[in-house]
Amino acid sequence: MVTSWYKIWYHTTQVIFILLFVGFSVVVPLDCIVQASDSSNDAVNTFIVVGAAVVLVVFGISISFARVLIFRRSLQDIPKKYIPVTAQDMRHKPSREYVIENMKRAGELAEKFKVPKEPVLHAGMEPKDSDMFPEHLKYAEIVKFISDRFRFDGALLLNFVTESDLSTTFKTALHKLFENEKHPYKQYLDEFISLYEKFRFSGQDIERNDFVKFLRLYKYLADLSNNLDLTRIESVPSQFLHVPTEDYDTDARSRTDSEFSTPYLRPYPSDAFMHNTTPASHVGSRSSNFSYDIDESAEPPESVEDQQRYHDMLTRVDTYNTVIHR
C-alpha cells in the first residue's frame, strides 16, 4: 500500500514540475516581446526577442545532453557481469522474464557445446581414435562389400557356393544354407537378414550399435556354417565366375605356384581365362576337366628380367595369396 501511494505521489509531482517548466519557458519569451513593444528602439527590441528565443533553445538542448551524459555515466558504473533479474533491477516483468529465460537457454547450450569427454558417435561412420574399428570406417561400405562378394564371387559367410546369379538373393541363399536348422539358429538368422536389408535398402545411416550387432551375428552364423554339410546346397553354375566352385580350393596355402591357375575371386574375370563350365555340387578338390581356351604358343617369350619383375609386383598383393603362393 505504501509503495502504491509513493508511486502516485512521485508521478503527480513529476507532472506538475514538467508543466511549470514548460509554462515558464513559454511565458518568458512572450513577456520579453510585450515589454520590447513598449520601447521605441527597434534594435534593442529585436535583440531582446531573439536573445530570449536563443537562450530558451540552448537551455533545452543543454538539459537534454546533460540527461544523456548522466545516463551513460550511470551505465558505466554498473558491472559488466551484472544482469537485471530482480524486480528492483527491472520493473517491467515481461522483460525480466525474457532475460531469465535466455539465461537458462544459454546455460543449456554451454553444456552441449563443451568439448566431449568421449568420441562423438555419428551414424554411418566410425569416430576418430576408436578402439574397436579403424577410424572413419564407413559402415555402409562393409555391408556393400559383403553383398558384392556374394554377388560376384559366390561367397556366403565363410563358404563358397555356386548360387551367385542375379536371380538368387542374399536372403534366399542364407535360408537355403540354414534350411534344416531350427531354433535358436533361425531366430538369429532372421535378425541378421533384417539388419542386412535395413542397411542396404532403407537409405538411412547405419547406427554403430546396429553395426556391431550385425557383425556379431555375422560371426556367429559364419562359425555355425562351418559345421554344416554343404553337399545339400543345390548346384547352379555362376554367370559371373565362369568356373565351377570346385576349381577353388579354400585352403589356398596348400597350393603350389603351378596350381594357381586363375585369379582368386575376381568380380569380372578376363575373357582370356574363360573355360568350359560343368555343374559342381560343392566346394572341393580341383576338377580334372579344367582347361583354358587360350593359345599359349601365341604369347611372346619373356626374358628372365621380365619374369622377375612381374613376380615382384604380384607378390606385393597381400590378399591371402591371391596370385602367387609365397
Curated annotation (Swiss-Prot):
How does the record classify its membrane topology?
Multi-pass membrane protein
Which positions are tagged coiled coil? none
Tell me the keywords, alphabetical order: Membrane, Transmembrane, Transmembrane helix
Q: Disulphide bridges in this chain?
A: none
> Per the record, where are the segments of Acidic residues compositional bias?
293-305
Biased-composition ranges for Polar residues? 276-291
Tell me yes or no: is Cell inner membrane among this UniProt entry's keywords.
Answer: no
User: What SUPFAM superfamilies is this protein classified in?
Assistant: ARM repeat
Give me the Cytoplasmic side stretches, as residue ranges. Answer: 1-13, 67-326
The protein's superkingdom reads Eukaryota
Q: Which parts of the chain does the record assign to the membrane side Extracellular?
A: 35-45
**Any one GO cellular component localisation term in the record:** membrane
Q: Where in the cell is it found?
A: Membrane
| Function statement | Required for growth under high-pressure and low-temperature conditions.
Classification via PANTHER family: DEFECT AT LOW TEMPERATURE PROTEIN 1 (PTHR40021:SF1)
The UniProt entry's sequence similarity note says: Belongs to the DLT1 family.
What is the name of the protein in this document? Defect at low temperature protein 1
